[in-house]
Amino acid sequence: MGVTAFLFMRDIKTMKIAVVGSGISGLSAAWQLARSGHEVSLYEAGDYFGGHTNTVDITVDGKTFGVDTGFLVFNHRTYPNLVRLFDDIKVNTSASDMSFSCKLPLSDQPGARMLEWAGANLNTVFAQRRNLFNPRFLRMIRDILRFNRETTQMAQSDRAMDDMPLGDFLARRQYSTEFRDWYLLPMAGCIWSCPTEQMLAFPLATFVRFCQNHGLIQVSNRPQWYTVTGGARHYVVQLLKEITNKYLKTPVKSISRVDLGAQRQVKVESAMGSLMYDQVVLACHSDQSLALLSDASAEEKKILSAVGYQPNHAVLHTDASCLPARKQAWSAWNYESAGTQEPRVCVHYLLNMLQPLPCKTPVIVSLNPLSEPDPASVMGRFDYAHPVFDSAAIAAQQALPGIQGQRNTWFAGAWTGYGFHEDGLKSGLAVAEGFSIRAPWRSAGMAVGAS
Protein backbone atom coordinates (compact mmCIF):
# COMPACT_ATOMS: atom_id res chain seq x y z
CA MET A 1 0.00 0.00 0.00
CA GLY A 2 1.67 3.24 -1.15
CA VAL A 3 1.27 6.79 0.14
CA THR A 4 -1.88 7.59 -1.84
CA ALA A 5 -3.64 4.42 -0.76
CA PHE A 6 -2.62 5.02 2.83
CA LEU A 7 -4.12 8.51 2.82
CA PHE A 8 -7.49 7.23 1.66
CA MET A 9 -7.63 4.05 3.76
CA ARG A 10 -6.22 5.02 7.15
CA ASP A 11 -8.39 5.77 10.13
CA ILE A 12 -8.26 9.50 10.91
CA LYS A 13 -8.29 8.88 14.68
CA THR A 14 -5.40 9.99 16.85
CA MET A 15 -2.49 7.61 16.34
CA LYS A 16 0.50 6.55 18.40
CA ILE A 17 3.56 7.38 16.29
CA ALA A 18 7.21 6.63 17.05
CA VAL A 19 9.81 8.95 15.54
CA VAL A 20 13.35 7.57 15.60
CA GLY A 21 16.07 10.21 15.36
CA SER A 22 16.03 13.82 16.58
CA GLY A 23 17.85 15.65 13.81
CA ILE A 24 15.99 18.28 11.81
CA SER A 25 14.03 15.57 9.94
CA GLY A 26 12.77 13.80 13.05
CA LEU A 27 12.17 17.02 14.96
CA SER A 28 10.12 18.59 12.17
CA ALA A 29 8.05 15.45 11.61
CA ALA A 30 7.44 14.97 15.35
CA TRP A 31 6.65 18.69 15.80
CA GLN A 32 4.04 18.63 13.06
CA LEU A 33 2.47 15.34 14.13
CA ALA A 34 2.32 16.31 17.82
CA ARG A 35 0.82 19.73 17.05
CA SER A 36 -1.92 17.96 15.15
CA GLY A 37 -2.96 15.85 18.13
CA HIS A 38 -1.14 12.59 17.50
CA GLU A 39 0.59 10.84 20.40
CA VAL A 40 4.23 11.12 19.37
CA SER A 41 7.23 9.44 21.00
CA LEU A 42 10.64 10.79 19.95
CA TYR A 43 13.60 8.42 20.39
CA GLU A 44 17.20 9.69 20.43
CA ALA A 45 20.17 7.38 20.94
CA GLY A 46 22.63 10.18 21.74
CA ASP A 47 23.00 12.45 24.75
CA TYR A 48 21.45 15.54 23.13
CA PHE A 49 18.54 16.29 20.80
CA GLY A 50 19.36 17.82 17.43
CA GLY A 51 21.55 15.49 15.38
CA HIS A 52 23.86 17.68 13.29
CA THR A 53 22.48 20.69 15.16
CA ASN A 54 24.96 20.59 18.01
CA THR A 55 25.55 23.79 19.97
CA VAL A 56 28.08 23.59 22.80
CA ASP A 57 29.08 26.11 25.46
CA ILE A 58 32.71 27.25 25.61
CA THR A 59 34.65 29.83 27.60
CA VAL A 60 37.09 32.00 25.62
CA ASP A 61 38.62 35.35 26.60
CA GLY A 62 36.79 35.13 29.92
CA LYS A 63 33.35 34.85 28.31
CA THR A 64 31.05 31.82 28.12
CA PHE A 65 28.86 31.41 25.04
CA GLY A 66 27.45 28.84 22.65
CA VAL A 67 28.96 27.86 19.30
CA ASP A 68 27.68 25.50 16.62
CA THR A 69 29.77 22.49 15.62
CA GLY A 70 27.51 20.99 12.94
CA PHE A 71 24.73 22.91 11.18
CA LEU A 72 25.93 26.51 10.87
CA VAL A 73 24.41 28.57 8.06
CA PHE A 74 21.43 28.96 5.72
CA ASN A 75 20.13 31.45 3.18
CA HIS A 76 16.70 32.71 2.15
CA ARG A 77 16.94 31.56 -1.47
CA THR A 78 17.54 27.84 -1.06
CA TYR A 79 16.28 27.25 2.50
CA PRO A 80 12.70 28.61 2.15
CA ASN A 81 11.07 26.13 4.54
CA LEU A 82 13.76 26.64 7.18
CA VAL A 83 13.29 30.41 6.94
CA ARG A 84 9.52 30.03 7.40
CA LEU A 85 10.04 27.61 10.29
CA PHE A 86 12.34 30.05 12.08
CA ASP A 87 9.80 32.83 11.53
CA ASP A 88 7.01 30.62 12.88
CA ILE A 89 8.83 29.63 16.08
CA LYS A 90 10.41 33.07 16.59
CA VAL A 91 14.10 32.20 16.19
CA ASN A 92 16.51 35.13 15.82
CA THR A 93 19.17 35.07 13.11
CA SER A 94 22.30 37.07 12.20
CA ALA A 95 24.11 37.69 8.92
CA SER A 96 27.01 35.32 8.25
CA ASP A 97 30.08 35.13 6.01
CA MET A 98 30.70 32.33 3.50
CA SER A 99 34.19 33.23 2.29
CA PHE A 100 36.46 30.37 1.18
CA SER A 101 40.22 29.78 1.19
CA CYS A 102 42.58 27.05 -0.01
CA LYS A 103 45.92 25.90 1.40
CA LEU A 104 47.61 23.01 -0.38
CA PRO A 105 51.03 21.88 -1.69
CA LEU A 106 51.90 22.65 -5.32
CA SER A 107 52.96 19.02 -5.79
CA ASP A 108 53.03 15.71 -3.93
CA GLN A 109 56.81 15.93 -3.50
CA PRO A 110 58.11 16.26 0.08
CA GLY A 111 58.80 19.86 1.01
CA ALA A 112 56.74 21.27 -1.86
CA ARG A 113 55.85 24.96 -1.70
CA MET A 114 52.37 25.78 -0.42
CA LEU A 115 49.68 27.52 -2.43
CA GLU A 116 47.37 29.87 -0.53
CA TRP A 117 44.49 31.86 -1.92
CA ALA A 118 41.02 33.03 -0.87
CA GLY A 119 38.04 34.12 -2.90
CA ALA A 120 36.79 37.20 -1.04
CA ASN A 121 38.37 39.79 -3.38
CA LEU A 122 41.35 40.30 -5.70
CA ASN A 123 43.61 41.06 -2.76
CA THR A 124 42.86 37.66 -1.19
CA VAL A 125 42.84 35.78 -4.51
CA PHE A 126 46.42 37.00 -4.95
CA ALA A 127 47.33 36.76 -1.26
CA GLN A 128 50.58 35.28 -2.57
CA ARG A 129 51.68 38.04 -4.93
CA ARG A 130 53.81 35.66 -6.99
CA ASN A 131 50.59 34.12 -8.29
CA LEU A 132 50.04 37.28 -10.36
CA PHE A 133 52.69 35.82 -12.68
CA ASN A 134 52.03 32.11 -12.14
CA PRO A 135 50.69 30.59 -15.41
CA ARG A 136 49.17 27.63 -13.56
CA PHE A 137 47.30 29.88 -11.14
CA LEU A 138 46.05 32.11 -13.95
CA ARG A 139 44.92 28.99 -15.81
CA MET A 140 42.82 28.06 -12.77
CA ILE A 141 41.15 31.48 -12.76
CA ARG A 142 40.45 31.29 -16.48
CA ASP A 143 38.83 27.88 -16.05
CA ILE A 144 36.74 29.11 -13.11
CA LEU A 145 35.25 31.75 -15.38
CA ARG A 146 34.73 29.20 -18.17
CA PHE A 147 33.11 26.67 -15.84
CA ASN A 148 30.76 29.31 -14.43
CA ARG A 149 29.80 30.38 -17.94
CA GLU A 150 29.31 26.87 -19.35
CA THR A 151 27.40 25.45 -16.39
CA THR A 152 25.18 28.53 -16.16
CA GLN A 153 24.22 27.97 -19.79
CA MET A 154 23.55 24.31 -19.02
CA ALA A 155 21.37 25.16 -16.02
CA GLN A 156 19.35 27.72 -17.98
CA SER A 157 18.91 25.52 -21.06
CA ASP A 158 15.63 23.73 -21.71
CA ARG A 159 17.55 20.62 -22.70
CA ALA A 160 18.02 17.87 -20.15
CA MET A 161 21.54 17.86 -18.71
CA ASP A 162 23.74 14.83 -19.20
CA ASP A 163 24.02 13.05 -15.85
CA MET A 164 27.55 11.80 -16.44
CA PRO A 165 29.93 11.83 -13.47
CA LEU A 166 31.47 15.23 -12.75
CA GLY A 167 34.97 13.85 -13.36
CA ASP A 168 34.02 12.66 -16.85
CA PHE A 169 32.65 16.10 -17.70
CA LEU A 170 35.85 17.82 -16.54
CA ALA A 171 37.97 15.45 -18.64
CA ARG A 172 35.74 15.70 -21.70
CA ARG A 173 35.76 19.50 -21.57
CA GLN A 174 39.52 19.54 -20.91
CA TYR A 175 39.45 21.54 -17.70
CA SER A 176 42.89 22.00 -16.18
CA THR A 177 44.15 19.97 -13.25
CA GLU A 178 44.78 23.29 -11.47
CA PHE A 179 41.10 24.20 -11.74
CA ARG A 180 40.05 20.74 -10.60
CA ASP A 181 42.51 20.30 -7.72
CA TRP A 182 42.95 23.89 -6.53
CA TYR A 183 39.35 25.09 -6.77
CA LEU A 184 36.45 22.86 -7.79
CA LEU A 185 37.13 19.71 -5.80
CA PRO A 186 38.20 21.58 -2.63
CA MET A 187 35.06 23.72 -2.78
CA ALA A 188 32.81 20.73 -3.44
CA GLY A 189 34.53 18.60 -0.82
CA CYS A 190 33.94 21.33 1.77
CA ILE A 191 30.27 21.66 0.85
CA TRP A 192 29.50 17.94 1.02
CA SER A 193 32.14 17.04 3.65
CA CYS A 194 33.50 14.18 1.58
CA PRO A 195 36.89 13.36 0.02
CA THR A 196 37.60 15.27 -3.17
CA GLU A 197 38.06 12.07 -5.17
CA GLN A 198 34.51 11.01 -4.27
CA MET A 199 33.23 14.24 -5.79
CA LEU A 200 34.45 13.11 -9.21
CA ALA A 201 31.66 10.49 -9.17
CA PHE A 202 28.99 13.09 -8.31
CA PRO A 203 26.26 13.23 -11.00
CA LEU A 204 26.85 16.31 -13.16
CA ALA A 205 23.21 17.43 -13.44
CA THR A 206 22.71 17.30 -9.67
CA PHE A 207 25.95 19.19 -9.07
CA VAL A 208 25.16 21.94 -11.59
CA ARG A 209 21.60 22.42 -10.30
CA PHE A 210 22.87 22.74 -6.75
CA CYS A 211 25.58 25.24 -7.68
CA GLN A 212 23.14 27.29 -9.75
CA ASN A 213 20.54 27.39 -6.95
CA HIS A 214 23.14 28.42 -4.37
CA GLY A 215 24.77 31.10 -6.52
CA LEU A 216 28.10 29.25 -6.63
CA ILE A 217 28.54 29.70 -10.39
CA GLN A 218 27.59 33.36 -10.45
CA VAL A 219 29.82 36.38 -9.90
CA SER A 220 26.89 38.55 -8.81
CA ASN A 221 23.48 38.03 -7.17
CA ARG A 222 24.81 35.55 -4.64
CA PRO A 223 22.58 34.91 -1.61
CA GLN A 224 23.28 36.39 1.80
CA TRP A 225 23.91 33.69 4.39
CA TYR A 226 22.64 33.68 7.97
CA THR A 227 23.22 31.84 11.25
CA VAL A 228 21.01 31.32 14.30
CA THR A 229 21.88 33.98 16.88
CA GLY A 230 23.31 32.36 20.01
CA GLY A 231 23.44 28.91 18.43
CA ALA A 232 21.09 26.67 16.48
CA ARG A 233 20.02 24.81 19.64
CA HIS A 234 17.48 27.62 20.11
CA TYR A 235 15.30 26.21 17.34
CA VAL A 236 15.66 22.68 18.74
CA VAL A 237 14.37 23.86 22.12
CA GLN A 238 11.36 25.51 20.48
CA LEU A 239 10.40 22.39 18.50
CA LEU A 240 10.79 20.11 21.52
CA LYS A 241 8.20 22.14 23.44
CA GLU A 242 5.46 20.55 21.33
CA ILE A 243 6.65 16.98 21.95
CA THR A 244 5.64 15.47 25.30
CA ASN A 245 7.18 12.01 25.02
CA LYS A 246 10.88 12.41 24.24
CA TYR A 247 13.52 9.90 25.22
CA LEU A 248 17.22 10.81 25.33
CA LYS A 249 19.97 8.17 25.48
CA THR A 250 17.38 5.62 24.34
CA PRO A 251 18.66 3.79 21.27
CA VAL A 252 16.11 1.74 19.40
CA LYS A 253 17.27 -1.87 19.12
CA SER A 254 14.89 -3.16 16.46
CA ILE A 255 11.66 -2.42 14.64
CA SER A 256 9.22 -4.97 13.28
CA ARG A 257 5.84 -4.71 11.60
CA VAL A 258 3.18 -6.87 13.27
CA ASP A 259 -0.07 -8.02 11.66
CA LEU A 260 -2.95 -8.19 14.14
CA GLY A 261 -5.72 -9.54 12.00
CA ALA A 262 -7.15 -6.66 10.00
CA GLN A 263 -4.82 -4.23 11.74
CA ARG A 264 -1.07 -3.75 11.46
CA GLN A 265 1.10 -2.16 14.14
CA VAL A 266 4.78 -1.48 14.59
CA LYS A 267 6.80 -2.93 17.46
CA VAL A 268 9.66 -0.76 18.67
CA GLU A 269 12.20 -2.38 20.98
CA SER A 270 14.45 -0.25 23.18
CA ALA A 271 15.73 -0.11 26.75
CA MET A 272 12.15 0.74 27.73
CA GLY A 273 11.01 -2.64 26.43
CA SER A 274 8.75 -3.50 23.49
CA LEU A 275 6.16 -0.84 22.71
CA MET A 276 3.49 -0.93 20.02
CA TYR A 277 2.74 2.00 17.72
CA ASP A 278 0.37 2.66 14.85
CA GLN A 279 3.12 4.19 12.69
CA VAL A 280 6.88 4.70 12.78
CA VAL A 281 9.01 7.44 11.22
CA LEU A 282 12.65 6.50 10.71
CA ALA A 283 14.41 9.87 10.66
CA CYS A 284 17.99 8.65 10.68
CA HIS A 285 20.60 7.77 8.09
CA SER A 286 19.32 5.25 5.57
CA ASP A 287 21.83 2.59 6.60
CA GLN A 288 20.81 3.03 10.23
CA SER A 289 17.14 2.70 9.28
CA LEU A 290 17.84 -0.53 7.43
CA ALA A 291 19.78 -1.95 10.39
CA LEU A 292 16.79 -1.31 12.67
CA LEU A 293 14.24 -3.07 10.46
CA SER A 294 14.16 -6.72 11.46
CA ASP A 295 11.75 -7.56 8.64
CA ALA A 296 12.87 -5.22 5.84
CA SER A 297 11.29 -5.88 2.46
CA ALA A 298 13.39 -6.43 -0.65
CA GLU A 299 12.55 -2.93 -1.88
CA GLU A 300 13.42 -1.36 1.49
CA LYS A 301 16.76 -3.17 1.46
CA LYS A 302 17.50 -2.04 -2.10
CA ILE A 303 16.73 1.64 -1.44
CA LEU A 304 18.16 2.03 2.06
CA SER A 305 21.43 0.24 1.28
CA ALA A 306 22.16 2.34 -1.82
CA VAL A 307 23.37 5.46 -0.01
CA GLY A 308 26.92 5.51 1.33
CA TYR A 309 28.15 7.69 4.19
CA GLN A 310 31.43 9.47 4.87
CA PRO A 311 32.48 9.56 8.55
CA ASN A 312 33.97 12.89 9.62
CA HIS A 313 35.70 13.86 12.86
CA ALA A 314 35.35 17.46 14.06
CA VAL A 315 37.59 19.17 16.61
CA LEU A 316 36.60 22.42 18.34
CA HIS A 317 39.69 24.44 19.28
CA THR A 318 41.51 27.80 19.24
CA ASP A 319 44.79 26.83 17.53
CA ALA A 320 45.04 29.24 14.57
CA SER A 321 48.15 27.55 13.12
CA CYS A 322 45.87 25.50 10.87
CA LEU A 323 44.66 28.63 9.04
CA PRO A 324 46.46 30.18 6.04
CA ALA A 325 49.85 31.67 6.91
CA ARG A 326 48.72 35.02 5.50
CA LYS A 327 46.02 36.43 7.75
CA GLN A 328 44.45 38.31 4.84
CA ALA A 329 43.49 34.90 3.41
CA TRP A 330 41.66 33.78 6.55
CA SER A 331 38.11 32.92 5.55
CA ALA A 332 34.96 31.41 7.02
CA TRP A 333 35.74 28.08 5.29
CA ASN A 334 39.44 27.19 5.04
CA TYR A 335 40.29 24.11 2.99
CA GLU A 336 43.60 22.37 3.65
CA SER A 337 45.19 19.48 1.77
CA ALA A 338 48.37 17.49 2.22
CA GLY A 339 48.32 16.47 -1.46
CA THR A 340 46.22 14.67 -4.04
CA GLN A 341 46.62 11.34 -2.23
CA GLU A 342 44.96 12.61 0.97
CA PRO A 343 41.87 10.39 1.50
CA ARG A 344 39.95 12.86 3.68
CA VAL A 345 38.58 16.32 3.20
CA CYS A 346 39.99 18.78 5.73
CA VAL A 347 38.28 22.11 6.32
CA HIS A 348 38.69 24.59 9.16
CA TYR A 349 35.56 26.63 9.96
CA LEU A 350 36.51 29.98 11.50
CA LEU A 351 33.47 30.48 13.71
CA ASN A 352 34.27 34.13 14.43
CA MET A 353 33.43 34.86 10.77
CA LEU A 354 30.42 32.54 10.65
CA GLN A 355 28.75 33.53 13.92
CA PRO A 356 28.71 36.73 16.01
CA LEU A 357 31.03 35.60 18.81
CA PRO A 358 31.93 37.87 21.77
CA CYS A 359 35.66 37.14 21.56
CA LYS A 360 38.71 38.02 19.46
CA THR A 361 40.56 34.73 19.86
CA PRO A 362 39.95 32.56 16.77
CA VAL A 363 37.45 29.78 17.50
CA ILE A 364 37.73 26.97 14.97
CA VAL A 365 35.95 23.75 14.10
CA SER A 366 38.39 21.56 12.15
CA LEU A 367 36.86 18.74 10.14
CA ASN A 368 39.34 15.86 9.79
CA PRO A 369 42.38 18.01 10.74
CA LEU A 370 45.60 16.98 8.99
CA SER A 371 47.57 17.66 12.17
CA GLU A 372 46.30 17.67 15.71
CA PRO A 373 45.63 21.11 17.21
CA ASP A 374 47.51 22.08 20.36
CA PRO A 375 45.92 19.86 23.04
CA ALA A 376 45.61 22.86 25.37
CA SER A 377 43.39 24.57 22.79
CA VAL A 378 40.93 21.70 22.25
CA MET A 379 37.44 22.22 23.70
CA GLY A 380 35.53 19.33 22.16
CA ARG A 381 35.49 16.46 19.67
CA PHE A 382 32.51 15.28 17.63
CA ASP A 383 31.81 12.58 15.07
CA TYR A 384 29.40 13.09 12.19
CA ALA A 385 28.56 11.20 9.00
CA HIS A 386 27.49 12.76 5.70
CA PRO A 387 25.74 11.05 2.77
CA VAL A 388 27.74 10.43 -0.39
CA PHE A 389 25.79 11.27 -3.53
CA ASP A 390 26.52 9.11 -6.56
CA SER A 391 24.25 7.65 -9.22
CA ALA A 392 23.10 4.85 -6.88
CA ALA A 393 22.09 7.37 -4.20
CA ILE A 394 20.17 9.49 -6.71
CA ALA A 395 18.33 6.39 -7.94
CA ALA A 396 17.42 5.51 -4.33
CA GLN A 397 16.00 8.99 -3.80
CA GLN A 398 13.84 8.62 -6.89
CA ALA A 399 12.55 5.22 -5.73
CA LEU A 400 11.83 6.28 -2.13
CA PRO A 401 8.21 7.47 -2.67
CA GLY A 402 7.31 3.90 -3.63
CA ILE A 403 7.89 2.65 -0.07
CA GLN A 404 6.73 5.69 1.94
CA GLY A 405 3.87 4.72 4.22
CA GLN A 406 4.01 1.06 3.30
CA ARG A 407 3.70 -1.29 6.27
CA ASN A 408 3.05 1.75 8.50
CA THR A 409 6.65 2.90 8.00
CA TRP A 410 7.98 6.28 6.86
CA PHE A 411 11.49 7.48 6.06
CA ALA A 412 13.00 10.95 6.45
CA GLY A 413 16.46 12.46 6.40
CA ALA A 414 18.69 14.90 4.58
CA TRP A 415 19.89 11.93 2.51
CA THR A 416 16.62 12.21 0.56
CA GLY A 417 17.82 15.52 -0.98
CA TYR A 418 21.20 17.24 -1.28
CA GLY A 419 22.18 16.39 2.29
CA PHE A 420 21.57 19.80 3.85
CA HIS A 421 19.34 21.19 6.58
CA GLU A 422 16.62 22.31 4.18
CA ASP A 423 16.53 18.79 2.72
CA GLY A 424 16.15 17.22 6.14
CA LEU A 425 13.38 19.66 7.04
CA LYS A 426 11.57 19.10 3.74
CA SER A 427 11.65 15.34 4.27
CA GLY A 428 10.18 15.67 7.78
CA LEU A 429 7.43 17.99 6.54
CA ALA A 430 6.73 15.64 3.63
CA VAL A 431 6.15 12.77 6.07
CA ALA A 432 3.68 14.94 7.99
CA GLU A 433 1.93 15.70 4.71
CA GLY A 434 1.52 11.94 4.31
CA PHE A 435 -0.80 12.27 7.31
CA SER A 436 -2.58 15.24 5.66
CA ILE A 437 -0.80 17.69 7.97
CA ARG A 438 0.52 20.82 6.29
CA ALA A 439 3.16 23.16 7.63
CA PRO A 440 1.68 26.41 9.01
CA TRP A 441 3.20 28.47 6.20
CA ARG A 442 1.68 26.31 3.47
CA SER A 443 -1.40 28.54 3.60
CA ALA A 444 0.78 31.22 2.01
CA GLY A 445 1.12 29.04 -1.06
CA MET A 446 4.57 27.60 -0.47
CA ALA A 447 5.05 23.95 -1.32
CA VAL A 448 7.23 21.76 0.86
CA GLY A 449 9.30 20.98 -2.19
CA ALA A 450 10.08 24.60 -2.99
CA SER A 451 13.76 25.23 -3.60
Per-region residue spans from a language model:
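Conserved flavin/dinucleotide-binding core of flavoenzymes
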Residues: 57, 118-120, 342-451
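Glycine-rich FAD pyrophosphate-binding loop
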Residues: 34-57
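Helical element adjacent to the flavin cofactor pocket in flavoenzyme catalytic cores
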Residues: 209-266, 270
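Conserved Rossmann-like nucleotide-cofactor binding loop
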Residues: 25, 48, 287
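N-terminal Rossmann-like FAD-binding beta1-loop-alpha1 element of flavoenzymes
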Residues: 16-42
